[in-house]
Amino acid sequence: RFDVPIIAAGGIVDGPSMAAALAMGADGVQMGTRMVASAESPIHDNWKQSIVNGSEADTVMVNRHHRPAMRVFASDKAKALEAANEPAALDIDAMMGTYFGGDMESGFAMSGQVQGRIDAVRPVADVLREAWDDCQSVLRTLGTAAAEGSISA
């Protein structure tokens, strides 16, 4: 046991993925890519639309063998850096150009493979309400199945 909450992150975008994390012992979840593509996110709409329009294959890993490793939108700049296996220079002006200016080639737009499961920019309240309702439904179904003996440890 840990005396601090364990927060699961990576690959969590909806109720079923939230339920999976909780079933594995997480105390909570972080839905990074899902929250970037929310109506309230201050991130530029170009980035949000790259998530909505992208598939799970539209991301690349930069700094795979360096730190910090990052999964990002597969811009031409990111693909070239991944292919060269060169460390990425984190330029704050370039990042600001991506985050708030919408220049998807300027910096790196961090995005997980779960972007392939995001089909709209929605209000956070709607995302969380639906995710929590779906999570509870999945956990109830698993609890019923375990009680009936149709699944076992």
Question: Where are these predicted regions, by residue range?
Answer:
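Conserved active-site-proximal phosphate/metal-binding subdomains
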Residues: 1-7, 12-153
